[in-house]
Amino acid sequence: HDMMSGSFLFPPHNPENDIAILFIETSGCLPMCGHGTIGTITIAIEEELIQPKVPGKIRMEAPAGVVEIEYHETNGKVEWVKLRNVKSFLAAENLTIDCPELGEITFDVAYGGNYYAIVDPQSNFTGIQDFTASTIIQYSQVLRERINLKYPNAFIHPENDTIRDVTHLLWTGDPLDPTSSG
């Protein structure tokens, strides 16, 4: 269940905000979770677990910071949710790590509420289209651990030292459909 997550709702610390959310997964607590935010806000609005100060807008506290959310509701159902996440930044470029099955992999690390290692297509990784989801998950677990061992204390948020280490891997590839976008 490495890819599953959950959330706990709390009253906000700052009364200007609507809610505080703590995200959890098998590795522990996450500073932020985009898909978790969308799902949690959807159910919290539909089940009337929160009463936003401004209809259609929510200010949410997460360990990573305040996230601004907009949503649209019709007949008690949330139709869409969009969020403005915490500030993101590039933390490192062109790092390398040995992947037992693939050999040396080059990757970048970016922050967007969590630290993500980003693996683009390269000579020994042609893209996600050539791998099963379970294989990518397996590689991700191994590489996450290896990255944090090889680069100890390299990924610590400059404003919150409790946010540290690569917690996610993002594998990319070419679009499967040339008309795809996004």
Task: Identify the residue ranges that each predicted region occupies.
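Active-site proximal loop and beta-alpha junction motif in alpha/beta enzyme cores
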Residues: 1-32, 39-182
